[in-house]
Regions:
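Post-Walker A helix-loop "phosphate-sensing" segment adjacent to the P-loop in P-loop NTPases
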Residues: 122-132
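Acidic metal-coordinating catalytic centers involved in nucleic-acid phosphodiester chemistry
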Residues: 1-72, 230, 558, 565, ...
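Walker A/P-loop nucleotide-binding motif
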Residues: 99-117
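C-terminal leucine-rich, beta-strand-based interaction scaffolds used for sensing/assembly
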Residues: 304-482
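Winged-helix-like regulatory helical subdomains adjacent to P-loop NTPase cores
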Residues: 33-89, 109, 263-325
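Conserved P-loop NTPase "ATPase switch" module shared by AAA+ and STAND
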Residues: 133-142, 146-178, 183, 187-190
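Alpha-helical repeat scaffolds
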Residues: 370-374, 409-424, 451-470, 498-518, ...
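Conserved small helical "lid"/interfacial subdomain of P-loop NTPases
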Residues: 191, 200-247
Length: 597
């Protein structure tokens, strides 16, 4: 290429060039009012957008989680349900954001929070709001200035912050700088939201609790179930369940899919045609330990909410450099499971990632390899708060561990997982590790009663956690006390009816711990978790309680009910409220029968 390729070259000389350069207006061509942003994406609706939904679009949306914005805009504009389903939560959330300053949408993987957020954004665009989405990767040095410029330029503004708990510095700045008509639409996975929301609203008060509305999107409402049935009918996605009648399909969504989009998607993956392809992937994965660990690293990092999975990060987890080889990444299993671009490595489907992990053919092989990956990433950490330690903490937490381990023999796999992590020297001195280990042993008690032997281990782990915690200045032990309360409820359930006094004493210990935690003054909804197991204890011993025990039990339930009545509503609070109310009602009913015989 030569300079003449760009046009005619005129010899003007150096002096002429210098004079012309001095006279150039560097502001020419720029609109001083133009907003230049790099940390946010301005969401806009293209005019005359007409696109028809194809079957391939539906499959790509459901299995790969890839949203076509033009089709989504059509849905909002035309009020249709061809591409996505207009859900009850969406309408409730939209109304609440119009009335309040902040809306938080939270839900687990593949349950529709991103689509719901986009639909709400498009609706508000049509009502005159300017909508800005925070990019996954932004410059902290300039993002605050961009927020200020946006707020100066536009009166009605909505900021969408995905994974908001990891971006609280930006959220806090918007909250402090906001105008009268500034709104925030925040999204998060359920685990992160529940972990931090109490601190954000009640302890640090980074958002106004009276102006912040929380909407869980995990569950499909009763009114929307039939919409989902019609949607699956229209696109022939029922597979071998196509012959089900309406009631059978409703029961499938409610029970098998747990009234969740996530459950419906897993059901689609279980169809014979898709399942046979996945079985081939399993065989290729277990055929090579190197392939298995690299694939597992990418899948686990995706599920643990890492936005940018780089080759270096995968290499750090596997302690292997194979991922840098293009020939290694060109293997068929990578092509089928992983997308690669300049930002890093991404599973083609989050729901497929979870399905592969949940249904792994050999749980022991998976657990052993996950332990190796966790040990590797832990060994790379040089600070309590560096990226490697944050990844390790995520993967080693009970909430994530139960999602990345096979559903077959889940509790046994969890226990084996924490037994493996116990070999890390630092973890044996960490109270939080022993707490997670205890939670693993307490897990899934609703499916079967925990054995007395298992509960002995639970007590040992909790005693270790509490002892280590007390040696650390200002260590907050409420989480340990919460699991102690849960332990006492589970222990009470193991006694025979003839040992009702021992069972009742353990119940009182659980009650006293719950009251102690509440009096500590740090608001946390986790306090209600042990309460959700009271019903099984009551059902077992209700016919053998002494009169004074019934009186005390009723008083305990009333005291706790009074406490949690002031808690913001969520699924666990509602469940605890219902259980306590039913116990009180049953005690009063039985007393009424006795007194009127």
């Amino acid at each position: 290429m030569d300079i003449s390729d760009f046009g005619t070259v005129l010899p003007i000389g150096i002096e002429k060039f210098a004079n012309d350069f001095d006279n150039v207006d560097i502001l020419a061509g720029f609109d001083n009012d133009e907003l230049i942003i790099s940390n946010f994406e301005k969401i806009e609706i293209e005019p005359n957008n007409i696109s028809k939904v194809k079957d391939a679009d539906i499959f790509t949306l459901l299995i790969n989680g890839k949203v076509k914005d033009n089709l989504l805009i059509n849905e909002v504009t035309n009020n249709e349900n061809n591409y996505v389903i207009s859900r009850e939560q969406e309408n409730i959330a939209f109304g609440d954001l119009k009335e309040n300053k902040n809306l938080i949408l939270y839900g687990d993987l593949s349950n529709g929070k991103t689509i719901t957020a986009k639909i709400i954004a498009y609706k508000l665009l049509r009502e005159g709001y300017e909508v800005f989405l925070l990019n996954d990767f932004y410059l902290k040095d300039s993002v605050f200035n961009e927020v200020d410029e946006i707020l100066k330029k536009f009166e009605k503004t909505i900021f969408i912050i995905e994974n908001y708990t990891a971006n609280m510095d930006v959220v806090a700045h918007i909250n402090i700088s906001r105008n009268l008509n500034t709104k925030m639409l925040l999204t998060s996975r359920t685990f992160e939201h529940e972990k931090y929301i109490d601190d954000i609203l009640f302890n640090k008060k980074q958002l106004d609790v009276n102006e912040t509305f929380e909407e869980a999107v995990d569950k499909i409402s009763e009114n929307d179930i039939e919409k989902f049935i019609n949607y699956l009918d229209r696109y022939g996605l029922w597979s071998e369940k196509s012959s089900f009648n309406l009631m059978q399909k409703k029961n499938y969504i409610k029970n098998k899919a747990n009234s969740e989009i996530h459950g419906i998607l897993l059901g689609i993956l279980e169809s014979p045609a898709v399942k046979s392809k996945i079985d081939l992937l399993f065989k290729e994965m277990v055929g090579s330990e190197t392939i298995l660990r690299n694939i597992l690293a990418i899948l686990c990092l995706n599920i643990s909410n890492i936005n940018k999975v780089t080759h270096h990060l995968v290499s750090a987890m596997t302690n292997d450099s194979s991922i840098f080889s293009s020939s290694f990444r060109e293997k068929s299993i990578f092509y089928q499971l992983v997308n690669e671009n300049t930002d890093g490595l991404f599973p083609k489907s989050s729901i497929l990632s979870e399905y592969i992990l949940e249904n792994f053919l050999n749980p022991e092989v998976l657990v052993n390899n996950l332990i190796v990956l966790c040990k590797n990433i832990h060994s790379k950490s040089f600070s309590r708060n560096d990226m490697y330690m944050q990844i390790y903490k995520d993967l080693a937490s009970f909430r994530y561990a139960q999602r990345i381990l096979p559903k077959r023999n889940k509790r046994e796999s969890l226990i084996n997982f924490y037994e493996g992590l116990r070999e890390i020297d630092q973890e044996r001195k960490n109270p939080h590790f022993w707490l997670q280990y205890a939670i693993a042993r307490l897990s899934f008690s609703d499916k079967d009663n925990l054995s007395s032997e298992n509960l002995i281990y639970v007590r040992h782990h909790l005693e270790t956690a509490l002892s280590l915690a007390r040696s650390i200045p200002n260590y907050w032990t409420d989480d340990i006390d919460t699991q102690y309360a849960r332990y006492y409820v589970e222990l009470a359930k193991t006694y025979s009816l003839s040992d009702v006094d021992l069972a009742f004493n353990d119940f009182i210990k659980a009650y006293e711990l719950i009251i102690k935690i509440h009096k500590g003054g740090r608001y946390k909804k986790e306090i209600v978790r042990p309460i959700t197991f009271f019903d099984k204890f009551y059902q077992k011993f209700s016919e053998v309680f002494e009169e004074d025990q019934k009186i005390k039990l009723e008083l305990c339930c009333k005291n706790i009910l009074k406490i949690i009545t002031n808690y913001p509503t969520d699924v666990r609070v509602i469940k605890a409220n219902k259980i306590l109310s039913e116990i009180i009602k049953d005690i009063n009913f039985k007393n009424h029968i006795i007194n009127n015989v």
